[in-house]
Amino acid sequence: PYRRQRQMCIRDRYYLACLVQENPFIDPDYIEGLKTTKDKVKRERLLKGNWEYDDNPNALCSHDAICEIFGNKISIKTGTNYITGDIARFGADYARLAVWDGWHIIELQCFPVSKTTDIQTWIINKQKKYRIPNHKCIVDEDGVGGGVVDNCDIQGFVNNSTPFNGENYQNLQTQCGYKLADHINATEVGIDEDLISTADKEEIIRELEQLQTWKADSDGKLKLKPKEEIKMDIGCSPDWRDMFLMRAWFDYNEYDIPDDIERRLGITA
């Protein structure tokens, strides 16, 4: 991929990105040709400067569907709030946490260093602000996240655990990744644009584009592109992706309580 090749450039040379419109010597007809071309990949790369754009046959969701997330006016908001968080493993990378209204992110926090006390305080404060019970909060249970799960008494996400309902996935992370892709393709996922910087937006797009199917196991189970391969392609761990896909956990652990539950249980007549 383009990004991997760029990272292999000679150390004393630098890449300066610019758009074709910034070239004073370019033929105007060339630009018009890019605007009208039916080759979507060429238009995105050469006209809009989206060099990472690729119609990857293994992609679970399209570039356009991912971009619709930002400022999405038709995302699913239910009035039910959740918290999801990817806690950096043993203090490395960033910790990413979000408050959701349905499938729309309404608050976001990034911790450059995973201090569990800061993360726990943030989670508890948001629980109080939005009245979010413990069973509607989840963070990854690997590494540092395990302490947050125990101390806050919230749900723990175990990547390699068994998928729900006996579905044909390699593990829980794969199952939730595919489910997230379904929601993205249905234009149900959203985030308030004023919550993120341009750099974070670009990073989220890159990471969600890594939601790709991978070689099936010998038993035919569906797989996601491995994290090691993702790191090679984008140069970092997909923390944003993991924070997003944990929201899908609640699709398998949400139960509607009937309005007449007391009557059904024989508590009232």
Q: Where on the chain are the PLM-derived regions?
A:
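Conserved AAA+ ATPase "SRH/arginine-finger" region at the nucleotide-binding site
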Residues: 16-23
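Mg2+-dependent endonuclease catalytic cores in nucleic-acid-processing enzymes, primarily RNase H-like
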Residues: 99, 103-223, 264-269
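Hydrophobic/aromatic beta-strand patches that form the interior of the parallel beta-sheet core
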Residues: 14-16, 83, 155-157
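Short, flexible loop/turn motifs enriched in small residues
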Residues: 89-96
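Acidic two-metal-ion nuclease catalytic site recognized across multiple nuclease folds
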Residues: 70, 109-110, 205, 209-269
